[in-house]
Amino acid sequence: MTELLKTPIHPLYAKYGAKTIDFGGWDLPVQFAGIKAEHEAVRTDAGLFDVSHMGEILVKGPDSTSYLQYLLSNDIEKIKIGKAQYNIMCYENGGTVDDLVVYKKSETEYILVVNAANTEKDFEWMVQNVRGDVTVTNVSAEYGQLALQGPSAEKILSKLTDVDLSSISFFGFIEDVEVAGVKTIISRSGYTGEDGFEIYMASADAGKVFEAILAEGVAPIGLGARDTLRLEAVLALYGQELSKDITPLEAGLNFAVKLKKEADFIGKEALIKQKEAGLTRKLVGIELIERGIPRHDYPVFLNDKEVGIVTSGTQSPTFGTNIGLALIDTAYAELGQELEVGIRNKKVKAKIVQTPFYKRAK
């Protein structure tokens, strides 16, 4: 059996009562105090996630921008220095290699933050598709990453740094910021639907920053609540809402797919064809009318015809409703449409509802 990978925070997990699981080859906390309590902490106050398992890939060189324009779906030329941008990396057929965030450090230097389980695959794909004068380096082992999320995030982090955090706009970042005496990069971003920050530092310093933030009375949060939070906010999870077989258009991520940008990007032609032909399936939100929780890969029916598949589902800790996301044949994907979800041996009534399920008050 392969030994599970561990983040630099791993030695501290037991101290805070973590229950760990194998997540994509990493030994990570699924919960600390409990998923519902952790979810509520992030929605109402703040919570701290260890996300050091995420991958970081450095792209440097005079042709970095044109290379990333070729590799990624969004318009890289629109990113200003000190800003980040959500992106999709596609295969030629329009399927998804990964979804990721691009940080622009300078005109010739970018950091791509990718999903942990995809880091090696992404890195190989990027190297395989190098164009022009660029170097691509997997620097994941050098970084620790924490996410402080929730309405109180700014107030709490402000106690540990001299930087005016209110000056950082959404998807903006500042480098060389001291947090608890440690040099960090702070980005106003996250994966919860709340305000918050993602904080990058040298791996060796991650534990110090983690404990300094928790000492301010913040709850540590595990993967269980990370999943319920992102699902309520309808943020895609690779392997569920996106995969090599699911295009970003089917997943409803059109805002990150710039089919009109001048540069050709890998998958552009296939995505243009898909859009022109009309999508045959699309991602929708569902809510169960009868008892039961929709789960990944459960079939969806209309009468006795299978018309789709659940990609993610849970009981919403915020609303108490049983919600999910499903890829549904476009003909049956209208708001209010009643469907049935196959849960074990029975069909449970559901309806298509407006998404996101949760949107924070500005």
From Swiss-Prot:
> Cross-referenced SUPFAM superfamilies, in alphabetical order?
Aminomethyltransferase beta-barrel domain (SSF101790), Folate-binding domain (SSF103025)
Q: How does it assemble?
A: The glycine cleavage system is composed of four proteins: P, T, L and H.
According to its UniProt entry, the function of this protein is described as: The glycine cleavage system catalyzes the degradation of glycine.
An annotated GO cellular component of this protein is: glycine cleavage complex
Report the EC number(s), separated by commas if there are several. Answer: 2.1.2.10
Q: Which reaction does it catalyse?
A: N(6)-[(R)-S(8)-aminomethyldihydrolipoyl]-L-lysyl-[protein] + (6S)-5,6,7,8-tetrahydrofolate = N(6)-[(R)-dihydrolipoyl]-L-lysyl-[protein] + (6R)-5,10-methylene-5,6,7,8-tetrahydrofolate + NH4(+)
The record's Gene Ontology biological-process terms are: glycine decarboxylation via glycine cleavage system
Which InterPro entries did the record assign?
GCS_T, GCS_T_bac, GCST_C, GCV_T_N, GcvT/YgfZ/DmdA, GcvT/YgfZ_C, TrmE/GcvT_dom1
Please identify the protein, giving its name as recorded: Aminomethyltransferase
Instruction: Name the source organism.
Output: Listeria welshimeri serovar 6b (strain ATCC 35897 / DSM 20650 / CCUG 15529 / CIP 8149 / NCTC 11857 / SLCC 5334 / V8)
Q: Which HAMAP family match?
A: GcvT
As for family, the record states: Belongs to the GcvT family.
Q: Which UniProt keywords apply?
A: Aminotransferase, Transferase
Give any GO molecular function from the UniProt entry. Answer: transaminase activity
